[in-house]
Amino acid sequence: EATGYGYEIHEMSEMAQAPFGQIAISNQPSFHIPYLFRHSLHPEYTNLLIHQIRSQAFHQDFQAYPGDEDNGSLSAWYIWAALGLYPTCPGKPIYDLGLPLFKEVLLHLPNHELKICSNSHTTGAYFIQKARLDGKEKQEVSHQDLLEAQVLQFELSWLPPQA
């Protein structure tokens, strides 16, 4: 016979506080859910969810994280989301493209610096029109390409790209 905990576990309380349906970004198994839309008929939903989660679930006060920090996992999710990259499939050296938070970020890699730039400072520009790695258009980026590249440029707009 299956029984419950006898009380509400913290993940359920956290999920009830967030207006994101079943995503529950406070629980690690949900971290990848917004990025799965990149592989669907509606990839534009990824960036809408990322924007909503970053702006509504994370705060700059004493309760910065939605739920407990779990040894840095929520911080790591937020950093990936702010960079505009996400390792959706563990063990596969591919990053899905998301919604960069900053106009420019400089990553200090072992042999060089990688600049990630976007026009994301423009309010409402949540949709990727084009992403270029050293001038070549990309839909996703390999780890090796990131290690060798100089510039990852996101061109964002207010409307999703036309199919």
Cite the ranges covered by each PLM segment:
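Active-site core of glycosidic bond-cleaving carbohydrate-active enzymes
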Residues: E1-L101, V105-E113, S120, Q144-V151
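Short coil/turn linker and secondary-structure boundary residues
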Residues: L41, K136-V141
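Exposed beta-strand and adjacent loop surfaces of beta-rich binding modules
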Residues: E104, I128-K130
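Short strand-turn-strand beta-turns centered on an Asx-Gly dipeptide
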Residues: P110, K130-E137
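Core dinuclear metal-dependent hydrolase active-site scaffold
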Residues: G124-Y126
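C-terminal beta-strand-rich structural cap/linker in extracellular carbohydrate-active enzymes
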Residues: H143-A163
